[in-house]
């Protein structure tokens, strides 16, 4: 009995008609219990699975200055007090909005910082 290589199989398939190829695919699907369309369906599954997964609650927040009102000096003072930055660094942060004041902090601390900055005259977002 001679062995058949992959190359022999490929050459044989190349000589088949479209109808014969279709019948071959159907026969392979039945014999091995697979579907030729499965990879396409499987590619779409992760998107649905991701939507069904429960959303994890965010535990770390960032405080971002999005705008500075008329009280720029007060905002700079608050940024210095909150971040322990020097005067020049705090001024640069306030002038280059949006700017992250603090990141990776708990929600209650982020809310307290946002309140301080808002009272000083800044527009703030918690992300």
Swiss-Prot record:
Keyword Ribonucleoprotein tagged: yes
Entry's Gene Ontology BP terms: translation
Subunit description: Homodimer. Part of the ribosomal stalk of the 50S ribosomal subunit. Forms a multimeric L10(L12)X complex, where L10 forms an elongated spine to which 2 to 4 L12 dimers bind in a sequential fashion. Binds GTP-bound translation factors.
Family annotation (PANTHER family): 39S RIBOSOMAL PROTEIN L12, LARGE RIBOSOMAL SUBUNIT PROTEIN BL12M
InterPro entries on file: Ribosomal_bL12 (IPR000206), Ribosomal_bL12_C (IPR013823), Ribosomal_bL12_C/ClpS-like (IPR014719), Ribosomal_bL12_oligo (IPR008932), Ribosomal_bL12_oligo_N_sf (IPR036235)
HAMAP family cross-referenced by the UniProt entry: Ribosomal_bL12
Record-linked SUPFAM superfamilies: ClpS-like, Ribosomal protein L7/12, oligomerisation (N-terminal) domain
Function: Forms part of the ribosomal stalk which helps the ribosome interact with GTP-bound translation factors. Is thus essential for accurate translation.
Pfam families: Ribosomal_L12, Ribosomal_L12_N
GO terms, molecular function: mRNA binding; structural constituent of ribosome
Cysteines paired by S-S bonds: none
Keyword terms: Ribonucleoprotein, Ribosomal protein
Domain of life: Bacteria
Name used for this protein in its record: Large ribosomal subunit protein bL12
Organism: Syntrophobacter fumaroxidans (strain DSM 10017 / MPOB)
Family matches, as CDD domains: Ribosomal_L7_L12
One GO term describing the cellular component: cytosolic large ribosomal subunit
Homology family: Belongs to the bacterial ribosomal protein bL12 family.
Keyword Ribosomal protein: yes
């Amino acid at each position: 009995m001679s062995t058949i290589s992959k190359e022999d199989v490929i050459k044989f398939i190349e000589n088949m008609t479209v109808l014969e190829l279709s019948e071959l695919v159907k026969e392979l699907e039945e014999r091995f219990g697979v579907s030729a369309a499965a990879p396409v369906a499987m590619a779409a599954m992760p998107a649905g699975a991701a939507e069904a997964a429960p959303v994890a609650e965010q535990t770390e927040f960032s405080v971002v200055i999005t705008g500075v009102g008329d009280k720029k000096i007060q905002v700079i003072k608050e940024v210095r007090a909150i971040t322990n930055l020097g005067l020049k660094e705090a001024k640069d942060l306030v002038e280059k909005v949006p700017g992250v004041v603090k990141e990776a902090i708990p929600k209650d601390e982020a809310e307290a910082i946002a309140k301080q900055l808002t009272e000083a005259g800044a527009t703030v977002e918690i992300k």
